[in-house]
């Protein structure tokens, strides 16, 4: 099993393996098998289109967690320039599960903030698997208030399984930190554009997700609990995660139907991990368009629009 492919992608993985084997045979024997390789590559593209045209919520959830999916720092590298990271909450520590700082987006100064997961074991531990502690949310809020002070729009990138549930985090006021962020973000006098680039896990996502426009990547998810967690509660078994994912309506398409998501950003065929650069440029285009829409409003119009947006949830 190719670990770069998810379980539902194994038919694609098998075709890819055949293509690689043919390439090796051709190289070793100087045979011209390019026509057969081209035929298999066309078949692979057709199969990928077929599989990805009818994905269920559980398959989307797996894609949202793909280990090679671009993370916040990848987007900062490809989308922004002159990024200057800012550290610490000025109270306790610097939470590396949240990254943020001043950058330029197409020449315009912005404050960019996002969750950051890790790829290798050491980085995963350093980033706490993308699960922020209270100091991470307080750092994010400090950066947002700085952005407001200097009239810079805020761009947030959401990708977390949720806020860290450890005892230390609870003792330092995890719920208070999240709630305070929600309250302050609702009245910041600067545009806020948020994008779910992977997992949007409950309050851990909302704490940097109160915004004027919410976008989601095509294979992102947003939910109050993971499918496995929901299945464990309802059916006492994580094996029914697929049923839970479908019932919760966690996909971008379903959330747009419910009026929660404004824009769905299409991903490359096969998912965002197939081409970080292509995905980043699509994200950049959509963020710039959203900023143009929000910066055309007066401060009073912006705040009224944000308030009405928040009050409309659940109606």
Swiss-Prot record:
Pathway: Lipid metabolism; malonyl-CoA biosynthesis; malonyl-CoA from acetyl-CoA: step 1/1. It catalyses: N(6)-carboxybiotinyl-L-lysyl-[protein] + acetyl-CoA = N(6)-biotinyl-L-lysyl-[protein] + malonyl-CoA. Pfam families: ACCA (PF03255). It is found in: Cytoplasm. It comes from the Bacteria. Belongs to the AccA family. One of its GO terms (cellular component) is acetyl-CoA carboxylase complex. The keyword Lipid metabolism applies. It is an enzyme of class 2 (transferase). GO terms for biological process: fatty acid biosynthetic process; malonyl-CoA biosynthetic process. One of its GO terms (molecular function) is ATP binding. NCBIfam families: accA, AccA_sub, PRK05724.1. Keywords: ATP-binding, Cytoplasm, Fatty acid biosynthesis, Fatty acid metabolism, Lipid biosynthesis, Lipid metabolism, Nucleotide-binding, Transferase. Acetyl-CoA carboxylase is a heterohexamer composed of biotin carboxyl carrier protein (AccB), biotin carboxylase (AccC) and two subunits each of ACCase subunit alpha (AccA) and ACCase subunit beta (AccD). Its main location: cytoplasm. Gene3D superfamilies: 2-enoyl-CoA Hydratase, Chain A, domain 1. Its EC number is 2.1.3.15. Residues 40-293 form the CoA carboxyltransferase C-terminal domain. This is Acetyl-coenzyme A carboxylase carboxyl transferase subunit alpha. Component of the acetyl coenzyme A carboxylase (ACC) complex. First, biotin carboxylase catalyzes the carboxylation of biotin on its carrier protein (BCCP) and then the CO(2) group is transferred by the carboxyltransferase to acetyl-CoA to form malonyl-CoA. It comes from Marinomonas sp. (strain MWYL1). The keyword Nucleotide-binding applies.
């Amino acid at each position: 099993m190719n670990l770069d492919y998810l379980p539902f992608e194994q038919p694609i993985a098998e075709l890819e393996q055949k293509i690689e084997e043919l390439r090796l045979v051709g190289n070793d024997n100087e045979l011209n098998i390019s026509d057969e390789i081209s035929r298999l590559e066309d078949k692979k593209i057709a199969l990928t289109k077929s599989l990805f045209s009818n994905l269920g919520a559980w398959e989307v959830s797996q894609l949202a967690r793909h280990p090679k999916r671009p993370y916040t720092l990848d987007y900062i590298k490809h989308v922004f320039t002159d990024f200057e990271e800012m550290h610490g909450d000025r109270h306790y520590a610097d939470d590396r599960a949240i990254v943020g700082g001043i950058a330029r987006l197409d020449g315009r100064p912005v404050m960019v903030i996002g969750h950051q997961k890790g790829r290798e074991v050491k980085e995963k531990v350093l980033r706490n698997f993308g699960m922020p502690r209270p100091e991470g949310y307080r750092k994010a809020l400090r950066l947002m208030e700085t952005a407001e002070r200097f009239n810079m729009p805020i761009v947030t990138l959401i990708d977390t399984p949720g806020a860290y549930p450890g005892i230390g985090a609870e003792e330092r006021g995890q719920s208070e930190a999240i709630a305070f962020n929600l309250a302050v973000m609702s009245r910041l006098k600067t545009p806020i554009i948020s994008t779910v680039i992977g997992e949007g896990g409950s309050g851990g996502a909302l704490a940097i997700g109160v915004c004027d426009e919410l976008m989601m990547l095509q294979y992102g998810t947003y939910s109050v609990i993971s499918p496995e967690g929901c299945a464990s509660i309802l059916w006492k078994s994580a094996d029914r995660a697929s049923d839970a994912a479908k019932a919760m309506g966690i996909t971008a398409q379903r959330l747009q139907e419910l009026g929660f998501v404004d824009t769905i950003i299409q991903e490359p065929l096969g998912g965002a991990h197939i081409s970080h650069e292509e995905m980043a440029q699509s994200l950049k285009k959509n963020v710039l368009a959203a900023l143009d829409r929000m910066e055309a409003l007066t401060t009073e119009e912006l705040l009224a629009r944000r308030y009405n947006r928040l009050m409309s949830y659940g109606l």
